[in-house]
Amino acid sequence: SSPEKKNDMSKPGRMRFDNKKEPRSSAKNSGNGYGCVDVNAGREPLTGPGKYPSSFLLLLEHRKPPDKDRDRWDNVKGCERKDGKSHWYDSMLKHRSPREKTLVGSGKDSTNFVYRLLTEPLLNERAGCKVVDMWYSLSYWMDVVNKRFGLCHYLGSMMDHGRWNDYSLCKDSYAGKHKPAGGPPTPRLKNREECKFYWCWSGSEERAGGMGREYVMHSGGLYGDLTDKRDDPEPNGNLEGGV
């Protein structure tokens, strides 16, 4: 990884499911997050003012986990395509190399569409580490993306390229450490079923307008880092590239 990628949240293959403390069924009340939808169910034309571009339809990444990690991925459901092949979705937000992605339409537009979809209700909170209610964002994501675009989605698929992490507190985005003394609080969730969003703003993060883009999603023990700066082509503060 690049020298700037100091945060060890970037290490691949780190995801924790603790069945005793965080049962995988904990997503049952969080917008029907696990599993797939019929790829043709509920699809409708998306044209005219206020509609999202249908070119986003195939912003997908098809990767299958290694056998040694298969037990960690038993909540990822395979969606059957018309050709009978099964897709594994572990990322829906990334600009990837051609061999790693299937992208129809503009990558920037599609990526930013999803990123805004997930974070728009949060972006006005730019001071400290906030605990933000995710119900609106998650339900909106499920409705617009799953039902209208017909994408296979499970809670946590917006995480970065399968780089799973077992951090349950907000981290300092440039050093991978807890917030310094005197900084904003980083409370743990008490009720995992509430599906909260821990959002850390880091003044040291110059990309994306000074926004630290790490997050922790608590449901079924899923934790993740949204970004992969190693192939971020446009660190220009507008959420394009690598997000």
From Swiss-Prot:
UniProt lists compositionally biased (Basic and acidic residues) regions at: 1-25
Just give the chief location class. Answer: secreted
Query: Which superkingdom?
Result: Eukaryota
UniProt GO BP: killing of cells of another organism; monoatomic ion transport
PTM (free text) = Contains disulfide bonds.
Q: Does the keyword Mitochondrion apply?
A: no
Is the keyword Transferase in the record?
no
Tissue expression remark:
Nematocytes.
Q: Which GO terms describe its molecular function?
A: toxin activity
What this protein is reported to do is described as: Has potent hemolytic activity. Is lethal to crayfish. Causes cutaneous inflammation in humans. May act as a pore-forming toxin, disrupting normal transmembrane ion concentration gradients in susceptible cells.
Q: What is this protein called?
A: Toxin CcTX-1
* Natural source organism: Cyanea capillata
Organism lineage string:
Eukaryota, Metazoa, Cnidaria, Scyphozoa, Semaeostomeae
